[in-house]
Amino acid sequence: MTAQLIDGNALAKQLRAEAAQRAAALTARGHQPGLAVILVGEDPASQVYVRNKIKACEDNGFLSSFDRYPADLSEADLLGRIDALNRDPRIHGILVQLPLPKHIDSHKVLEAIAPEKDVDGFHVANAGALMTGAPLFRPCTPYGCMKMLESINYPVRGANAVVVGASNIVGKPMAMLLLQSGATITICNSKTRDLAAHTREADIIVAAVGRRNIITADMVKPGAVVIDVGMNRDDAGKLCGDVDFAGVKEVAGYITPVPGGVGPMTITMLLINTLEAAERAAEGAALAA
């Protein structure tokens, strides 16, 4: 068996085309979707991610605002800029690129973003609402993973799903979205004893721990769906995920590649979250008129 690829680039292209149409319709009504991105410091990976997000906005008819600050920016100044963006009616989504410099409290910064503009879904109000099944925004990477499962018409309800990784950004919300779709969830991490005992029982594996080759072929049930969220570098400096792709693709039923899998979907769902924020703002403006 050779796994079928879940092509994140192709799915992202389709979803972005749909988002661009909706954005054009909103813009025609005077409500162009707007995303503000803030980058503090010179982290090379963050610079790449931010460039990709800004380009995605520009390519799909979104207004984009990019604030780039030196690493010694004060926390107070950053909070002041977020406050200004919260009050700017042209901006519907605010994204602060992580990680932040150590002297800045990232929790405080994320909580400063207005929940209705928290398109990353990290604010405690949105994280809490996710628990109840009614979030304003789903975190972009888990949301993209769910769209990938949807694209192959996978029957999530009743499936055994193992999420490897328990971060607030991916692992925890991923587990919650799968649970709400009717899956039976096991959450593991890099220190889980006998990880393979859990993954071998899984119909769906989501690898999001940030460790190269943590999932190998002998750990995967034949026919399973394997979604690789990891972003690592191999010995040659080439981008790779958390999954041993060459081995696992001979066992799994479906697999996402790295690159070209989850990555493009994360940015796509950021656009969709921003679009939905703009649509809500437009509805609110119409009701107030």
Curated annotation (Swiss-Prot):
Keywords of the record: Amino-acid biosynthesis, Histidine biosynthesis, Hydrolase, Methionine biosynthesis, Multifunctional enzyme, NADP, One-carbon metabolism, Oxidoreductase, Purine biosynthesis
One Pfam family linked to the record: THF_DHG_CYH
CDD domains assigned to the protein according to its UniProt record, in alphabetical order: NAD_bind_m-THF_DH_Cyclohyd (cd01080)
Entry's EC annotation: 1.5.1.5, 3.5.4.9
Coiled-coil portions: none
Highest rank taxon of the organism: Bacteria
Glycosyltransferase as UniProt keyword: no
Catalytic activity of the protein: (6R)-5,10-methylene-5,6,7,8-tetrahydrofolate + NADP(+) = (6R)-5,10-methenyltetrahydrofolate + NADPH; (6R)-5,10-methenyltetrahydrofolate + H2O = (6R)-10-formyltetrahydrofolate + H(+)
UniProt cross-references to Gene3D superfamilies, sorted A to Z: Leucine Dehydrogenase, chain A, domain 1, NAD(P)-binding Rossmann-like Domain
GO BP, one annotated term: tetrahydrofolate interconversion
Binding site for NADP(+): 165-167, 190
Keyword NADP found: yes
PANTHER family cross-referenced by the UniProt entry: C-1-TETRAHYDROFOLATE SYNTHASE, CYTOPLASMIC, C-1-TETRAHYDROFOLATE SYNTHASE, CYTOPLASMIC-RELATED
Subunit architecture: Homodimer.
Protein task: Catalyzes the oxidation of 5,10-methylenetetrahydrofolate to 5,10-methenyltetrahydrofolate and then the hydrolysis of 5,10-methenyltetrahydrofolate to 10-formyltetrahydrofolate.
Protein name: Bifunctional protein FolD
Organism: Ralstonia pickettii (strain 12J)
Lineage: Bacteria, Pseudomonadati, Pseudomonadota, Betaproteobacteria, Burkholderiales
Gene name tied to this protein: folD
